[in-house]
Curated annotation (Swiss-Prot):
One of its GO terms (biological process) is L-histidine biosynthetic process. The active site is at D8 (proton acceptor), D129 (proton donor). This is 1-(5-phosphoribosyl)-5-[(5-phosphoribosylamino)methylideneamino] imidazole-4-carboxamide isomerase. It comes from Synechococcus sp. (strain CC9605). One of its GO terms (molecular function) is 1-(5-phosphoribosyl)-5-[(5-phosphoribosylamino)methylideneamino]imidazole-4-carboxamide isomerase activity. It is found in: Cytoplasm. Its EC number is 5.3.1.16. HAMAP family: HisA. GO terms for cellular component: cytoplasm. It holds the Pfam family His_biosynth. The keyword DNA damage does not apply.
Length: 255
């Protein structure tokens, strides 16, 4: 299972939100490039970027930081937040991003997701951000009536690379992942599922391993890394070790 560190960009800085609330912002670094290089040096094999300004306003406020990060790293970088047109998605791909994450447009313009997936095989990801099982859009400000599981089924056959599923209720809380929701999502999806939201300790990461055979192939970690609750290099090593041992025993040893 791939552990993917997250950098959330707001006004060019590296921040984290609590449950997606723009009024509950914690700033961690004013230099996102240095932060990205730090995650790479600790063993990250992929970086997850979120343009929070883009998600909220639909404008590419953080493009300079995104381009600088992409140019500085040797590992693949993926970005979500405010990507709501074909032109914008292709602009990001052309600047070196490995994957582009589409959230709001998956609800509002599903045909656009399908077209981009056909144009760029393996490079389009659908982000499903759910609150009580229903999809939230536009930076989690608007709540739809669409079930997250229905959206997963809809796009599984569209040629997308993966689904990133975020449980809004646990995001930024360090309270642990919503394992039942992840299991249900994986069972509904024919493409790999990447978990996001709630990771607070090493045991939380290990708790995801039983879901790997169902298709949960990665996990995005944010606040737990920034707060020092999880050491990235140790986590990568621990998940590798846990595949060879009883997961429960390893979790007990680390907790």
């Amino acid at each position: 299972m791939e552990i993917i560190p997250a950098i959330d960009l707001l006004d060019g800085a590296c921040v984290r939100l609590h449950q997606g609330d723009y009024d509950q912002v914690t700033r961690f670094s004013e230099d996102p490039v240095a932060q990205a290089l730090s995650w790479q040096s600790q063993g990250a094999t992929r970086l997850h970027l979120v343009d929070l300004d883009g998600a909220k306003r639909g404008e590419p406020i953080n493009d300079a930081a995104v381009r600088a990060i992409t140019a500085a790293l040797d590992i693949p970088v993926q970005l979500g937040g405010g990507v709501r047109s074909l032109e914008r998605a292709e602009e990001l791909i052309s600047c070196g991003l490995d994957r582009v994450i589409l959230g709001t447009v998956a609800i509002e313009q599903p045909e656009l997701v399908q077209e981009l997936a056909q144009r760029h095989p393996g490079r389009i990801v659908v982000g499903i951000d759910a609150n009580d099982g229903r999809v939230a859009t536009r930076g989690w400000i608007e709540q739809s009536d669409v079930l997250a599981t229905d959206l997963a089924k809809q796009f599984s056959a569209a040629g997308i690379a993966a689904i990133i599923t975020t449980d809004i209720a646990t995001d930024g809380t360090l309270a642990g992942p919503n394992l039942e929701a992840l299991r249900t999502m994986a069972q509904c999806s024919a493409v790999p599922v990447i978990a996001s939201g709630g990771i607070g300790c090493m045991a939380d990461l290990l708790s995801l391993l039983p879901l790997e055979p169902l298709g949960v192939t990665g996990v995005i970690v944010g606040r737990a890394l920034y707060d020092g609750r999880v050491d990235l290099a140790e986590a990568i090593a621990a998940l590798g070790e846990a595949r060879l041992q009883d997961v429960t025993a390893v979790a007990a040893d680390i907790a």
